[in-house]
Design a protein with these regions (language model features):
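Short Pro-Cys-Gly-centered "Cys-loop" motif that presents a nucleophilic cysteine in a tight turn
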Residues: 1-56, 65-238
């Protein structure tokens, strides 16, 4: 069976997941820092705007906007190749690190962008690595609330619209992050990303289909609402 091309809709954000294959993908602070350096370099070369990120031992997630159709693939391939080679050399390992290729999907920004950003920033809490997002070093949460500047992050217009000043935006994001997430919408996001089908309203999908590089949903489900199962039953990524 021919593999479908990766989704691409011009100027639309994507949620991206890389899942670990066996064992933790990061063993020390140097690993985390090197992965971020690889990400920053690859994003610059591939014209990939990074809006949110999290690195966890078993998986990583990103919220990005590609500048062109191959931006995500180019960046992910460059990051994985460069990081895995160095990780294996540093720790005396060999072989693959990630479970297949990356998973990604286009999301409707007005409805899902800020949700996806919060899901990413709170993934360490949801995975019981920490009790609060602000205490986890390896995510974009502290950037979004003004405690740190991640120079490779490009703030999305929807984040910028949270306030007229950096302080207002940071406080507004902090207030949003304090609200409980809609678990149904979280499952929608995770399931859509893992399966590679666009996430958005019917109107958005109809609009996006005009410029997308492939069909946006399975043929059998095009006229039906997708059945949503809890993504946590299928993956440890939350």
């Amino acid at each position: 069976m021919t593999r479908l091309a990766r989704h691409y809709v011009p100027e639309q954000p994507q949620h991206v997941i890389l899942q670990g294959l066996t064992g933790p993908a990061f063993l020390d602070e140097g690993d985390y820092l090197y992965f971020l350096a690889c990400l920053a370099d690859a994003a610059r070369v591939a014209d990939l705007a990074v809006h949110a990120w999290v690195l966890m031992p078993e998986a990583v997630q990103f919220l990005v906007t590609p500048g062109y159709e191959s931006s995500v693939a180019m960046a992910m391939q460059a990051v994985c190749r460069r990081y895995v080679e160095t990780f294996n050399r540093r720790h005396g390992r060999r072989g693959a690190m990630w479970r297949g290729g990356y998973r990604a999907t286009v999301i409707e920004p007005d409805r899902y962008f800020l949700l996806a950003s919060q899901v990413i920033d709170h993934a360490p809490v949801r995975n019981r690595l920490v009790s609060e997002a602000g205490s986890y070093q390896w995510s974009s949460y502290t950037h979004h609330v003004g405690r740190r500047v991640d120079s490779f992050i490009k703030d999305h217009p929807l984040y910028a619209a949270l306030g007229s000043t950096p302080l207002e935006r940071q406080q507004a994001y902090c207030n949003l992050a304090a609200q409980p997430l809609d678990e149904g919408e979280v499952d929608n996001l995770m399931q859509s990303t893992l399966k590679g089908w666009v996430l958005g309203s019917a109107a958005y999908c109809e609009w996006a289909a005009q410029t997308a590089n492939r069909r946006l949903m399975p043929l059998l489900l095009r006229d039906k609402p997708p059945k949503v199962r809890a993504a946590r039953e299928l993956t440890n990524v939350e």
